[in-house]
């Protein structure tokens, strides 16, 4: 007997993106000498008297059983040849936020779970792409081309299944769980692999001879509720692929921007300014489309060595005028420290946004005339 009806919305298109060994991958990218070696992000126990914990480890180190939250001492005992790096969390956060902006090219319904993973609802999306799988592939492509980092993607009709799918084929995998396949997929899954089922719950379930999703599917709903309360209620539904929690995006949009990665590096200032102008045009058009204007213009320049500079200019009054944004972007670029490396990415963003219907006068190109 069902306590509540099993309402299952299978019409949604949800993607879960999980960066692959994110911190370690960034360090390998920035220091090629680390590639092909077991790498641990965490304090070196030989320098701390055995204190410290592992933040993450690359896949080579994981083959030795090293994982997040393990003591650095145990990690060293498992793999004495591992390289330990304390890591640069400011750098990881900056890159993670930049990756998040890639997600928002496709949808504003982005729910970050941490700096290196997020849910995206692409049921309706900015590019009107019908296939969630195609969007997932495009995101993987964008992240690789712009950051030389990989991610794994899971695609399904709810967050629970998308999360399981992204973990199924790592690194750089893409797994899809269709509605008709969900119960069969879950039936074979060990209960400890169910996202949201903690260690203590696993122990209780094992004590009841419940080891897989199939075992859960065979237990009556009321029995699970009697044994586990609300957790049992949720588990009964999850084992059947039912989870209707929305992708929550409480973020108030504070900026509108556009950026592009170039397959051929830009070296000439004239070429760079031409591309900045094109980008400024896209931003101005987007501001007008959304009825917004902003007071701060920001440009982003990423060079061939992956170093990134962001500089801003604060205007006297808010604007959505293309020529103002273009002129500001050019002036910011003119004041950047000279860098002989080629430019691989350019971005222009207008921030400190407000409603463009407000009565204050907006800045126009005439304000630049002398």
Swiss-Prot record:
It comes from the Bacteria. The active site is at residue 117. Keywords: Cytoplasm, DNA damage, DNA repair, DNA replication, DNA-binding, DNA-directed DNA polymerase, Magnesium, Metal-binding, Mutator protein, Nucleotidyltransferase, Transferase. InterPro entries: DNA/RNA_pol_sf (IPR043502), DNA_pol_Y-fam_lit_finger_sf (IPR036775), DNA_pol_Y-fam_little_finger (IPR017961), DNA_polymerase-Y (IPR050116), DNApol_IV (IPR022880), PolY_HhH_motif (IPR024728), Rev_trsase/Diguanyl_cyclase (IPR043128), UmuC (IPR001126). One of its GO terms (biological process) is DNA-templated DNA replication. The keyword DNA repair applies. Its EC number is 2.7.7.7. CDD domains: PolY_Pol_IV_kappa. Pfam families: IMS (PF00817), IMS_C (PF11799), IMS_HHH (PF11798). GO terms for cellular component: cytosol. The keyword Repressor does not apply. Its cofactor is Mg(2+). Transmembrane segments: none annotated. Residues 14-198 form the UmuC domain. The record marks 23 as: Substrate discrimination. Its main location: cytoplasm. One of its GO terms (molecular function) is magnesium ion binding. It catalyses: DNA(n) + a 2'-deoxyribonucleoside 5'-triphosphate = DNA(n+1) + diphosphate. Binds 2 magnesium ions per subunit. It is found in: Cytoplasm. Mg(2+) binds at residues 18, 116. Monomer. Poorly processive, error-prone DNA polymerase involved in untargeted mutagenesis. Copies undamaged DNA at stalled replication forks, which arise in vivo from mismatched or misaligned primer ends. These misaligned primers can be extended by PolIV. Exhibits no 3'-5' exonuclease (proofreading) activity. May be involved in translesional synthesis, in conjunction with the beta clamp from PolIII. Belongs to the DNA polymerase type-Y family. This is DNA polymerase IV. It comes from Streptococcus mutans serotype c (strain ATCC 700610 / UA159).
